[in-house]
Amino acid sequence: MSPVSAIPLAYKLCLPRSLISSSRELNPLHITIPNLGMCRRGKSMAPASMSMILTAAVSDDDRVQRRRGNYHSNLWDDDFIQSLSTPYGEPSYRESAERLKGEIKKMFRSMSKEDEELITPLNDLIQRLWMVDSVERLGIDRHFKNEIKSALDYVYSYWNEKGIGCGRDSVVADLNSTALGFRTLRLHGYNVSSEVLKVFEDQNGQFACSPSKTEGEIRSALNLYRASLIAFPGEKVMEDAEIFSSRYLKEAVQKIPDCSLSQEIAYALEYGWHTNMPRLEARNYMDVFGHPSSPWLKKNKTQYMDGEKLLELAKLEFNIFHSLQQEELQYISRWWKDSGLPKLAFSRHRHVEYYTLGSCIATDPKHRAFRLGFVKTCHLNTVLDDIYDTFGTMDEIELFTEAVRRWDPSETESLPDYMKGVYMVLYEALTEMAQEAEKTQGRDTLNYARKAWEIYLDSYIQEAKWIASGYLPTFQEYFENGKISSAYRAAALTPILTLDVPLPEYILKGIDFPSRFNDLASSFLRLRGDTRCYKADRARGEEASCISCYMKDNPGSTEEDALNHINSMINEIIKELNWELLRPDSNIPMPARKHAFDITRALHHLYKYRDGFSVATKETKSLVSRMVLEPVTL
């Protein structure tokens, strides 16, 4: 099974009439078969006690028994989606937002004009860092790119290997200013070394936070924790910082009352960096920022920025984008319904969930093509996943793979009707996405994308062959093929090509296959997906996973041993992904790198607690409601 799942960028695509309305429509025939297993990832047969729901594909001259995943149906009725409405698309809200943007830009500019009461040589660094950190976490930073750069250039001009204090004339460096400065500067591409944190570490791995846990020391530990998650490979001090700060914060949050700081800590410990998403963080930080105990809304001589204006703009921006989300979601729901894909009852239909992820990644309104392309790509991947892993026969999936390789709709007569429809959806989707990409790239990228999908489908064929032969591969065999079948490349490539940044092929290969970035992202999704799905898969008779293959290679090892090994691999991959995102010698435009990186974060979020895609009735349903369906209260 692929941890990513997908469908393309077409609107008026319909499955063949024979599938939708004729007497040859697939009719489900529920049969209990005790000796057959459902295999989605290249698994062996189930034990004799395994019960299975099969669907018989009935035609005049053919009767094929087919396996079904028995997934729950789509949770979001099209009538409900089309009924959504919001007032936040009205011009008056945009006018208010524009006014606030101007006022906040004045706040940034005023920081360069020192005020004896508000901005002094003893607080000028931390004031700038607070301001930048706040607009970024509130999700409004895209409006202040120049102001952010100016503020960080100023901070960096006073940066040194012994850390910084609150201001340029501070006599002693402090952990809070240094940790926040290090994190912010590193994320913006400045050359800062993690060695600066050693200034605050003793020989026992303890950092400069006393056991008394005052509010100031707790905030220092929080910023140390946030900084530690942006680690590169080999940075021992970052490992020490994460261990110390996470333990310190877990103890502290038990002792302090419910307040903005406790909420901030709880969120940081829960989602960290690699299961976080820009829009999710913005929604949470509005609650933290606007809490009655929040220091950001208190007007005093040490707090320069007008927190109320920042919060007001953040809420307006969230709701204005929310109105755009509803329009796009209504389009996606119509597209899904009109395509005929709902007739494929055997497949998972998670277009709404995928739209939620896509809009949590790409929060700039102008990136509509990315959001819609991501949804369609991911949904099509899901349909193909369910065809190749459960519903389709070996003969059918080989025919389909060959049809994709030929790329000619006139040569699909050998396909069963349901596959003809899916093929046409794929064909039209990739064609339309290539047309969208041509607007930004200035060249035809269709053949490039097609090759990526051919390789992806070949990986499914390999897994199907393992199923048919009952072969349990070695860890390395499974992992190398599984990186491709994770579908990261298929899901990420075409949406990224629609971004408004030039990606000539020689640069594109630095983020696409066979780049280190692509290999790491695909590895990450395969490993994380397997750790969340292997028990449910095994219960359905699907044996092959990173866990089972590791245990095969290491006789006598336990599931716990395998999970420890895989989680260790994931931790190292995360650090390498950080480096690939932030490395100073990269020639890949940061918007492309960041969106590719955020796709891994979004999908990691989906697998944080469970397979949140196959089981979308719990945390994923709540995410949809909070991120897409519900505005914030102004």
UniProtKB/Swiss-Prot annotation:
Q: Where is the transit peptide?
A: 1-21
One Pfam family recorded for the sequence: Terpene_synth
Q: What is the E.C. number? A: 4.2.3.16
- Which residues are noted in the entry as Mg(2+) 3-binding? 529, 537
Chain ranges for the short sequence motif DDXXD motif as given in the UniProt record: 385-389
The pathway entry for this protein reads as:
Secondary metabolite biosynthesis; terpenoid biosynthesis; Terpene metabolism; oleoresin biosynthesis
**Keywords, A to Z?**
Chloroplast, Lyase, Magnesium, Metal-binding, Plastid, Transit peptide
A GO biological process this protein is involved in? response to wounding
Q: How many cofactor units bind, and how?
A: Binds 3 Mg(2+) or Mn(2+) ions per subunit.
What does induction of this protein depend on? Accumulates in apical leaders upon wounding in resistant but not in susceptible to white pine weevil (Pissodes strobi) plants.
- Which residues are Mg(2+) 2-binding? 385, 389
Q: Which GO terms describe its cellular component?
A: chloroplast
Catalysis performed (reactions): (2E)-geranyl diphosphate = (4S)-limonene + diphosphate
User: Which terms in the Gene Ontology molecular function aspect does this entry carry?
Assistant: (4S)-limonene synthase activity; magnesium ion binding
Cofactor(s) required, per the database record? Mg(2+); Mn(2+)
Per UniProt, (2E)-geranyl diphosphate binds at: 348, 385, 389, 526, 529
Family (UniProt): Belongs to the terpene synthase family. Tpsb subfamily.
Q: How does it assemble?
A: Monomer.
| Role summary | Monoterpene synthase (mono-TPS) involved in the biosynthesis of monoterpene natural products. Catalyzes the conversion of (2E)-geranyl diphosphate (GPP) into (-)-limonene. Not able to use geranylgeranyl pyrophosphate (GGPP) and farnesyl pyrophosphate (FPP) as substrates.
Q: What is this protein called?
A: (-)-limonene synthase, chloroplastic
